[in-house]
């Protein structure tokens, strides 16, 4: 076992020291001297969250299958250790070798959520790597960003040497080959980055320059050199059944957010909800063969000792082989004490039958995500869920023994009116009425309905990327309308209402659609002590307000205005496969309250067919 980077004295004074010692079950062990490339894979949040992330496990497995690469892991130190490392000048280290990140060739950071941006700076700072890419030395690691937030990398572009746009299974081989060649030729860091910019899916921010108009919008976004492409096209794994997948995932030492075998059975979504970024950037839908999934289930349970299988997908019910897969898992593993988790199911007879087999009905809740209370607003957002379907599904569930329902909605959606807000409470009441229509002797106790509302944040590459947002007071006012409406309902005692923090929503909106001018404010927030901003107990909105003011940033510019259709967005240089023409058409259909059929019902010509596979080609021979 390697010598630990932290002394016993430190480990005994911090919370959950097992976060930092490595050596877990299935951890890959190599001699760093035997490889050409050392890659530190980072999730910029605490160990328990990072260890639950499937994407990290996939890349960790894929990289370590190579003889020339050693991939190790690193997560954000909790604030108690952060303070000690700063005081004692201890450099951040990888779990496997316990060696400093600054000695690696690459530091890859997956970026899943905008509120983790300050943790990216924490990782760089504790690693003793210059936070600004322009200030890095020749022997510093190449810092790579990836994940969904890289579809608008501009607010954090100054901190990264390059971004990988798309799914990680595709272009890393070419990047590693180039890196080894450049090292052999002893070319400069800048020359490596310039050559890397020509690799499909690789975006090198320093190779592009941005000009702005007097009104603050972007005038142009252009490459600095002729051999640097003007457009960066996302990379996508089309053959899901033969793609790399971790049969021996690392098992955390302490309880993580998800200690389960995760079976990813498809990527993408056919539904086309107009607010949903994942539904657009992961197009087209691609399925994994059920026989492959059966093999993974056996192997991963055997290799981990986990007692739960979780199915991973944006919309589980749309998987064409779902019934066969679920019945296989139930028949082969339920009697062995293995729980089966089925998220993202539509509530219909099949789903209720399945959930009745795998869940304790008396303890579990039924989850609906109508997103909007009224049918009008559900049409605006293209949520293919009618009130009739919701009430019928709830009725079948209640008759099957359920009595707990969770409802998820968004406030602040485009075209929303007060009637739409009140409709949230009215829908919850109708569900309660449906429960109490069941004879008393057949009910399972009292009905419990929980309403949760988040505030809508427009995201890049969605039809709502042109939409405006609102300020904190407006969001809280909308939540009050819903809260007051709940109190007016006949079954109000059966309804509980929760809502999201408005300050965080506004910040998410600034960061989600921001540009390079946001970076100085991020640095200021970190300098003021901002880390773990995704955690309520550490988030301090005043830091952000002060930082934006000190940097002269008008936050309303990023949140409070509807964008004209011809505005150049910071992310327009990325080709994610879905055309801007399609997004504009969907934005206009939303305003007309028109519903667009899902991909299996009718192709809408979004552009994803260019990838020549998946759902786009299901009916073509």
Model region roles, listed by residue range:
Residues 77-222, 463-515, 522-537:
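Glycine-rich beta-alpha loop elements in corrinoid/cobalamin-binding modules
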Residues 53, 255-291, 602-620:
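Canonical Radical SAM [4Fe-4S] cluster-binding loop centered on the CxxxCxxC motif
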Residues 41-45, 63, 249-277, 301, ...:
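N-terminal pre-triad scaffold of radical SAM enzymes
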